[in-house]
Amino acid sequence: MTVRIGVVGTGAIGRDHARRINKVLGGAKIVALSDVNRASAEAVKNDIAPDAVLFATGEELIASPDVEAVLVTSWGATHEQYVLAAIAAGKPCFCEKPLATTAEGARRIVDAEVAHGKRLVQVGFMRRYDAGYVALKQAVDNRIGAPIMVHAAHRNPSVPEQYVTPMAIHDTMIHEIDVLRWLLDDDYVSARVLFPRSAARSHAKLKDPQIVILETAKGTIIDVEIFVNCHYGYDIQCQVVGEDGIASLPEPMSVQTRLGARLQNDILTDWKDRFIASYDVELQDFIHAAAKGTASGPNSWDGYVAAISSDACVAAQETQGAAVAIDLPARPALYQ
């Protein structure tokens, strides 16, 4: 069976996902495209999906009987409306993060999916599909005993001037917020944010670096360093301290050289290079589930919890180190 997929939003990530589906993965084909910039959709049609039909709006694409599943890769503020339309149409939907730009919007999606009675939404938290994180989770679940502490870091070489302090949470740490919750199988109960002295490469509207301290319901303490102007490379670190041992996220594969009296490994500089393979795996997972009329992987509840947790972290940026509670409602049975 070939799943007929429509793409709403043909910017950089939408174009890349369309390429993946038509050129790399199996079991699916791009049959429809829509973007507010018609020229963008036309370019994807010409370069990647020549048989695709162009639609004036995302809603028209979703309603088309020729479309069996939907990719929402449009501007973040539009995600909610398109995901809700896909649920109303009963069509599996892959939505890039964020699920919605507010926790209230994410909750509306959860409520709509629960009312529908079947999982239809997969959220694009691709780190769960990274081979290193999968191996780390196996170690956490089976080898090192109950987790006590987690030390994590998310470092970028640089960010543009328009990147401001809250974006360190909503745009950057959002990945840690999801993947660490999945890694520990535990929910957060509070967040604190500490600010060291700002790095010289920061700017007036960005406090960088920052340290976020999360506490979980089971009592695990997590510290996450966010340093988006580290200069030296793109570097993701994660170490879980358990009762019986320690497990660390593997480093990306790199050629080690012994040259000029130095032992060296290269460090990546681009997030796309670090996690490119996980995008293939997550979309293949979506295709397999969509062929059965459902969805798997990170779900709407995960997107909702990430929104609540990130909002709490942003609030904690203003409390001079005081903890902010993360209050989660009961999880619906659909997501148990």
Swiss-Prot record:
GO terms for biological process: inositol catabolic process. It catalyses: myo-inositol + NAD(+) = scyllo-inosose + NADH + H(+). Keywords: NAD, Oxidoreductase. It is an enzyme of class 1 (oxidoreductase). One of its GO terms (molecular function) is inositol 2-dehydrogenase (NAD+) activity. Its EC number is 1.1.1.18. The keyword Heme does not apply. InterPro entries: Gfo-Idh-MocA_inositol_DH, Gfo/Idh/MocA-like_OxRdtase_C, Gfo/Idh/MocA-like_OxRdtase_N, MI/DCI_dehydrogenase, NAD(P)-bd_dom_sf. Gene3D superfamilies: Dihydrodipicolinate Reductase, domain 2, NAD(P)-binding Rossmann-like Domain. Homotetramer. Involved in the oxidation of myo-inositol (MI) to 2-keto-myo-inositol (2KMI or 2-inosose). HAMAP family: IolG. Belongs to the Gfo/Idh/MocA family. This is Inositol 2-dehydrogenase. It comes from Agrobacterium fabrum (strain C58 / ATCC 33970) (Agrobacterium tumefaciens (strain C58)).
